[in-house]
């Protein structure tokens, strides 16, 4: 993600944007070869579900076996930070402007939605990945799967 992001986004709002982006992005198998987002969202959801219990287990296990408190806490904090890293990455991704090749495809999908009679809000500024996620989610609901053939 070497493209400039929206500078007005605060650190903590990236986590909320990451959650919204993960809920919005369509987890379709045909998008997986092109976008890494499918894998990151699945891994982040897995980490949100399983890392807190793993952190508690490793902390209790190391303390119960007479281990030192410092490494036990460090291991638990690392396990707890993994879901946050995923949400942060997704938040950064959601505000990243689309590269030119994906931008052209974004406008093609929007055009197909408008041809199908769907009312779309006008795009404000340069579209980002959140706008792409919203458009793709709507396209998967309203259009047939052939709109992905030119991807």
Curated annotation (Swiss-Prot):
A Pfam family it matches: DUF412
Transmembrane parts of this sequence: 46-65, 69-91
Entry superkingdom: Bacteria
Entry membrane topology: Multi-pass membrane protein
Subcellular location: Cell inner membrane
GO CC annotation: plasma membrane
Keywords: Cell inner membrane, Cell membrane, Membrane, Transmembrane, Transmembrane helix
Disulfide partners: none
InterPro entries for this protein: UPF0208
Similarity-based family: Belongs to the UPF0208 family.
HAMAP family per the UniProt record, alphabetical: UPF0208
Protein name as catalogued: UPF0208 membrane protein Ent638_2839
Organism: Enterobacter sp. (strain 638)
Taxonomic path: Bacteria, Pseudomonadati, Pseudomonadota, Gammaproteobacteria, Enterobacterales
């Amino acid at each position: 993600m070497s493209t400039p992001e929206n500078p007005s986004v605060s650190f903590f709002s990236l986590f909320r944007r990451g959650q919204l982006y993960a809920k919005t992005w369509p987890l379709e198998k045909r998008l997986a070869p092109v976008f890494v987002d499918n894998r990151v969202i699945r891994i982040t959801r897995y980490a949100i579900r399983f890392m807190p219990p793993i952190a508690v287990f490793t902390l209790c296990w190391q303390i119960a076996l007479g281990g030192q408190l410092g490494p036990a806490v460090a291991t638990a904090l690392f396990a707890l930070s993994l879901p946050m890293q995923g949400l942060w990455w997704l938040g950064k991704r959601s505000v990243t402007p689309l590269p030119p090749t994906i931008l052209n495809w974004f406008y093609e999908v929007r055009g197909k939605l408008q041809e199908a009679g769907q009312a779309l809000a006008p795009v404000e500024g340069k579209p980002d990945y959140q706008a792409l996620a919203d458009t793709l989610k709507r396209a998967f609901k309203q259009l047939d799967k052939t709109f992905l053939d030119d991807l």
